[in-house]
Amino acid sequence: PQLYKEILTSVFEKVFEIAQFYRAEESDTTYHLNEFISVDIEVAFAEAKDVMEVLEQLVVHVIREVKEKCESELKLLGRELEVPKMPFKRITYDEALEILREHNFRIEWGEDLPTPANRKLGEIFDEPYFITDWPRKLKPFYIKPKEENPKITESFDLNWSWLELASGGTRIHRKDMLVERLREQNLNPEKFEPFLTYFEYGMPPHAGWGMGFQRFLMVITGRRNIREVTLFPRDKNRLVP
């Protein structure tokens, strides 16, 4: 859906989607599935900071509504929700590495943050927080590099506790840059030609994000396993029912 919703921004300035995602996911953990629901937006003439504000407003609105209208259900789950304060804290990838080094984590620049590191950050920040400015090689080909430092991207992840809830950023809207990034990631641009064709006619600058619905439910309900908040979970070991 990612590539299709980007195309749609050339016609509709604001694109919203709630849909099933299917992924060849190799990870077999308590927070990964091969089929899941994603909540997505894509906005024309927007940057990462703009859609980050939309994301935090959505999270706060949902938490507030659940807290006010689902008191008995939350009590049954033994869950007390606190409405997060806006704006959410923002730290860069570099700042995250520095914080983790102070807690004896040794992560080289350009490496992804492993689960133990995310758990430690979740202990330090007790509310949702953004990690921004991720290295270029850690993000998909359609994420825009920063003009002042192309090794870094205009990207963000939204974390809460130890979970990554959402990921997004400013998108590349020029075909030549997309082709360059595809080749950089050892992908064949010819296989993406139906997508790239639309960029020949002019694509507006755009930004967006996708949020894993079940992971958000995990945070709301306090469950530790994504299968507890999913009807008929499907992972690498289970497809039926």
Predicted features and spans:
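Hydrophobic/aromatic-lined pockets within catalytic cores
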Residues: 8, 12, 23-27, 59-67, ...
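Metal-assisted phosphate- and nucleotidyl-transfer catalytic regions
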Residues: 57-161, 184-203
